[in-house]
Each structure stands twice: as C-alpha cells, then as structure tokens.
Amino acid sequence: KTGATIGKTAIVPEDLPRSNTTSHVGKITLPSNHCPEYFYYVLTSAVVQDQIQDLSAMQSTRPELGIDGMKNLKVVVPPLKEQNRIASYLDAETSKIDAVLNVKRSQLDRICDFKQSFVFEYVTGKKHIKEAM
C-alpha cells in the first residue's frame, strides 16, 4: 500500500476469512460473481500497476494508495464464466513460462558458478596463463 511495496497483490485463502490488515495493507473481498484468480491477474497487470502508481503519486510525497484510490482503478470485469476461463488459461500458460524460467535460472546459476571457479583458479595461482608462441 505504501512505498516500494505499493501494488503488491495476493489471494487470501478462503480458510483465512478473518485475516488481519493494517493501515498499510488493504483487503478486497470480492462478491461471489467475481473470480479471485482473475482479479489477481488484473491487479498485477502492467495496466493496473501503472494506474496504482499514478494514483498514489498524486496523493503525497510518500506513495500511498487508500481505499478511495482503489475505488478509482479502471478494470475490465467480464462475466464470471469469462473470468474463470481467462484465469484458467493464464494459470496454465504462466505455469509453462515459470517452468522455462526455472530451467534457465538453473542454467544461469551453473554458468555463474563456473565463472567464479574459473576466476578463482587463476587468481589463486592454481592455473597459469600459457604464453602465446
């Protein structure tokens, strides 16, 4: 809600209906004809995050977004069936992307480890540079 964490979004599980909030955390309780997963994607989208930044910047020198600012967010709300369809599709596709990212991160970690080892061997004298002939 404030500062660097403004716009962070999460879904509160239904088994935590009485979760606590503070003056820096807001909770949106959706009506039954709204899909929480769809609204998670909406609220984390670049379009809405830009709105959050714009609305919070207008309020003070320290970025803050109150409930009135939240009410001013412009979001598309299709029928529940379409919300569910969009959320399911995004869940499936972003899971695939996350799997690829995890593989790439693992590969990058191994390359970074190799680089550190490579540099270490030369700066500690374990290996020497061969002179060109």
What are the language-model segments listed below?
Residues 30-36:
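Ligand-binding loop in jelly-roll beta-barrel domains
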Residues 12, 30, 75-77:
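Hydrophobic residues in beta-strands and at strand termini
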Residues 26, 40-44, 54, 120:
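Generic alpha-helical structural context detector
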Residues 5, 18-26, 57-84:
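A short glycine-rich beta-alpha junction/loop motif
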Residues 23-26, 37-38, 71-72, 95, ...:
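Positions in alpha-helical segments
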Residues 76-133:
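Amphipathic alpha-helical coiled-coil/heptad-repeat segments
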Residues 2-21, 37-41, 50-56, 60:
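Short, ligand-facing micro-motifs at secondary-structure edges
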